[in-house]
Amino acid sequence: MTKPIIALLYDFDKTLCTTDMEDYAFIPALGYTPAEFWHKANTFGRENRMDGLLAYMYTMIAECRAQGKDLKRDFLVACGRSMELFPGVREWFQRINAFGEQQGVTIEHYVLSSGLKEIIEGSGIAHEFKQIYACEFYYDEAGAACWPKLDVNFTNKTQFVYRINKGVLDVADDKTLNDSMPDDSKRVPFTNMIYVGDGL
């Protein structure tokens, strides 16, 4: 008999790590304080009536280019190694998985974050997650970030809740996601989801 699945959905910034993930290494590498960088990104977004996350991703690329640097994937992953996780986070996954086993359920972990997937991949806990839904860059043939590949903003996070619900985890698969599906065919019922975050 298949065990019921309990999905734990996590925000990342200020939930698993202590502040915005870009603050630890990426922003200092550009010579800014976090306050300076976020003011620049937020001002750019407001002045251009942009989604705030697209504005910060644009600002990341623009500031790197202004300093003669390419924004490379490996650099962002390396930035994740400087991340400070809250006490107990690293041990949490093994503990809750074992508890789930005792209760006769399977625990799955997912990230729904407005931070950067690449930085999360360097955090040391990325392997704990079945899927990481977070902002992500597309990289050109030279390996430099040139376009947002995925934007996970504060309201479209609900799309990914539906993906987990239906078991349609591939972000490029909109057809299956939008197809009608009987409730008893959905992989993870909404009642089996727990969202962990400082806000949704």
Tell what function each PLM region has.
Residues 149-154:
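Long, low-complexity, charged/polar intrinsically disordered regions
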Residues 2-146:
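Alpha-helical substrate-recognition element adjacent to the catalytic core
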Residues 156-200:
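Conserved Lys-Pro-Asp/Glu-containing loop-to-beta segment of HAD-superfamily phosphomonoesterases
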